Amino acid sequence: MKSKEILGYDIKEISNQTVEQLIEKKKELQGKLNDLQQELLKRKVEARMGTLKNTASIRNLRKDIARILTLLSIINKEIENKKKESKK
């Protein structure tokens, strides 16, 4: 059975990483998220002005943002679980 991937990140791989690695991935994803949000804002302005050529790009950016938010949620839960396990 093939494991699920989101934006090139294997979900099963995430659970096998250390807290430090997860925090590093989280920072990387937050940077990508900020970039995508800025790009989405630019595209929305272009759409308002009528200069946007590819209207589907807004929808695709929103989907990518949702994927990153999903990954961040998974990573945050995994970090919490690993911290709880280390306290035991």
UniProtKB/Swiss-Prot annotation:
UniProt keyword annotation of Ribonucleoprotein present: yes
Alphabetical keyword list: Ribonucleoprotein, Ribosomal protein
Ribonucleoprotein keyword on record: yes
Pfam families reported for this sequence: Ribosomal_L29
Coiled-coil annotated residue ranges, if any: none
One of the GO biological process terms: translation
One GO location term (cellular component): ribonucleoprotein complex
InterPro entries membership: Ribosomal_uL29, Ribosomal_uL29_CS, Ribosomal_uL29_sf
HAMAP family: Ribosomal_uL29 (MF_00374)
Family, similarity comment: Belongs to the universal ribosomal protein uL29 family.
Protein name: Large ribosomal subunit protein uL29
